[in-house]
Structure formats: structure tokens, C-alpha cells
UniProtKB/Swiss-Prot annotation:
Keywords: ATP-binding, Cytoplasm, Disulfide bond, Nucleotide-binding, Redox-active center, RNA-binding, Thiamine biosynthesis, Transferase, tRNA-binding. This is tRNA sulfurtransferase. One of its GO terms (molecular function) is tRNA-uracil-4 sulfurtransferase activity. One of its GO terms (biological process) is thiazole biosynthetic process. Belongs to the ThiI family. Catalyzes the ATP-dependent transfer of a sulfur to tRNA to produce 4-thiouridine in position 8 of tRNAs, which functions as a near-UV photosensor. Also catalyzes the transfer of sulfur to the sulfur carrier protein ThiS, forming ThiS-thiocarboxylate. This is a step in the synthesis of thiazole, in the thiamine biosynthesis pathway. The sulfur is donated as persulfide by IscS. It is found in: Cytoplasm. Pathway: Cofactor biosynthesis; thiamine diphosphate biosynthesis. Its EC number is 2.8.1.4. It comes from the Bacteria. ATP binds at residues 184-185, 266, 288, 297. Residues 405-483 form the Rhodanese domain.
Amino acid sequence: MKFIIKLFPEITIKSQSVRLRFIKILTTNIRNVLKHLEDDTLAIVRHWDHIELRTKDGNLGPEICDALTRIPGIHHILEVEDRSYSDMHNIFEQTLEAYRETLVGKTFCVRVKRRGKHEFSSGDVERYVGGGLNQHIESAKVNLTRPQVTVNLEVDQDKLILVKARHEGLGGFPIGTQEDVLSLISGGFDSGVSSYMLMRRGCRVHYCFFNLGGSAHEIGVKQVAHYLWNRFGSSHRVRFIAIDFEPVVGEILEKVEDGQMGVVLKRMMVRAASQVAERYGVQALVTGEALGQVSSQTLTNLRLIDNASDTLILRPLISHDKEHIINLARQIGTEDFAKTMPEYCGVISKSPTVKAVKAKIEEEESHFDFSILDRVVSEAKNVDIREIAQQSREQVVEVETVAELADTDVLLDIRAPDEQEEKPLKLDQVEVRSLPFYKLSSQFADLDQSKTYLLYCDRGVMSRLQALYLREQGYTNVKVYRP
């Protein structure tokens, strides 16, 4: 079985030295991706305008073809069969044998590519073979503009190459031809698509996740990152860095004015990610921000977010609308992950600014204890992406959700103080206590552990994440309250 791998057109217009480097990297990437097949008969040979792949194990054909369609740098893949030929009539006879059943009742055209010196041209072969097929298959008709079947042939010196199938590739540049980037991934639609777009452009994409509460969300995001890597970037080893950002969020909620919280949080994330990028020699950050999508993504606010660090920030989705982003997520397979990913509800301003003022932002940040940011970055967890598959299979501790309260239960309102003031929680015959989520990890141990505590927040997301975290710490007296 033989495959001819055609290069992405942008590769073919590079200078000779760059083109050779790109082809060499693409060949190495293909070998790395197919290494798990353990096929001793697999042979990959690079040429000036294509890469040739052969295997004697025909059963591996579908798996090889599927893998090739997901490797950046490949324009299309031709599944071919090599034959020898004697003359133009012999080419027609072999084509008729191969395509007779396929062309019954169909419109068709013949397309020929030729390399070498011959007594005939490509057009001569197209006319001769096409006319012969039209005469010998009565129900078939020639259609040169919109054929149902295109008969693709290649004549290479003394070989006839019958193209049995054509499969579209991913396009783009081979991973490793551009420098590394660090994607700020949240598991939603935007960050997954932006990560994919940079992989397709030839970057090795590492992942940085800011954990805003509990392991359930982290495991979900790890699964998204592993899926993207396994599907499009498994030719290279990458890092997954998880940063516990809950202490930073708590400091923002206590020290920063409501309207400035969103921009300040993004600036803190950029600062933290920049430190991580510098640590690992990564050249740029990648975010899924789109212009005007939310309040922090206006031009004014994006400029202020950029000013928090000297590191280059790439935003491949900046001009894309949400519908287009969701369609892209559907195409690459991350839509289902994104739809079920919990959205963090801890830092939601009642009146977020859409045109932040630099002096005001800097004044608010002057109240922030930056030693907290330095600490969470220094404690960041660095995981090899290949280890995530095993970690993701581990059971997540289940937390019971209740809709009714017992007299002995204590309800913990874990919302931020301003949310509690705006929508006070009043329940008869049940003790209600206020303990913002960002204080749970440090103050829950001080509570009476003989009682059962029900955690409450508006959406039920933060309460579940915090309950999971407490269960992992060994506390069994926690549940989630969802009326």
C-alpha cells in the first residue's frame, strides 16, 4: 500500500533551504505520529514536491490515512497503486479495469499529471483514456466541469500511478517550523479553537490553565488539552501547566473595585503566564479573545491587558464572531467538551468597565499583594501532556446535591460579599452562614465538623467545585444546595 503526501502550497513557494527544512520536519512529524503502529514495513521517503509512504500491511491503511489527515503541513493525501505500462493504450486498459465498476451510471472526467520524457502529453492521455472509458462504459458520460467522479492518473517516467482515493489534509505548516507558544486554555470554545489555529500554523502549543476552584474543572480542561494534542499535535512533547489562581481571585475580590475586576484579573493572568513562558523559553502567549465579545475585550481594555507584560500576545480569533468560532470547534471536535465545561462565576462585576483608564487600573493594583501572584506561579504544576490520559481516567469524587434542607444542616453562602449584599439568602429554620469561596480552603477547618454543611452559589458551579475540593481534602460533611 502506498500513499503520496502532497505539501501545503505555502511550503512550495519557500526558498530552497527553507523548503527542505520544512519537508524534513514534516517527515519527522509523520514518523513520530505513526510510531505507535510498530510497523516494521513502514517506509517514509521525502522528495522535492511530495513525501512517499509505503507499507506492506494493508490492514493499517485506514488508520494511517486518518492520522495523516490530522498532521499540519499536509495539503492532501493520495492513496495510490503503482503499475508498469507499455504504451498509452495500455494505460487506458489498466484504467478501465480499475474504474469500470466505479463509473457505471456516473459522469466523469480524466485528469493526468506527467513527469519525465514521453512521446505523449498529459492532454493526450486525458483525451485517449477518457474517450475509451466513454465508449466502453455505456452508462457513463463525460462531464469536464462538474463530474461525479474524477479519474486521477499520474505517469511518472515508466510508472503508471492509479489514484484510488484522495483525502484532504489539514494544511498549514508542520509543527516545529515556528517557535513555541503558551496557550491560556479554559476549556471553552475560544481557547480550544485558538490553540488549534496556532498548531496548524506550525507552532508547538503548550497549555497554561488558571484553576479558579476545584479539580473537576482542571480535569475537564486537561481532557480538552490532551484531545487537541493527541489529535493534531502528538508529533511533539508539550507541557500542561496548572496554576492555582484562587488566592489571586480572593485578593482581587477583597482589594479591587467592582468595575475594574475583569481587567485586573486578565492582567494578573498575563503576568503569571509571562513568567511561565519566560521560565520555559516560550516566545508568545495565545488567547481566545475576540474583539467586543465581552466587556474586557474592547480595544481599550485589550491594550491595557497587553501592557501588563512585554510578552507577545497572539489572538487568532480577534475578528471572528461567536457563531464562526463554535462552527470551528465543531469541526475540530472540541464543541462537546466546551458545552459541558463549567463557567467560572467567581469574578463577575455588576458593572464592568468597557473603557478602563490606565491610572485607575494601576491605582487598584497598588492595593494588590503581588507576593500572592509570585507564590502561585512558583507553585505551578507542570505535567507532561502524555501523562494526562492516565490522570483523566481517575475517578472524580462525587458530591451529593440536595434540594431540601434538614433542620440540623448549616447553609454556607459562598458567594462573593457584593453578591450576597445584592441578593441576600434568607431561609427559615436553617442556619445560614457567610463564607466566601476564596476563604473556604483556609477557614473551613475552623468550623464545627460535627455538622453537615451545604454550599450555595447562584449557578451551582462554584459550589460544586468547592465541595469537590473539600472532599478531596478529606471532609465528608459537605454537600451542594440547589433549590
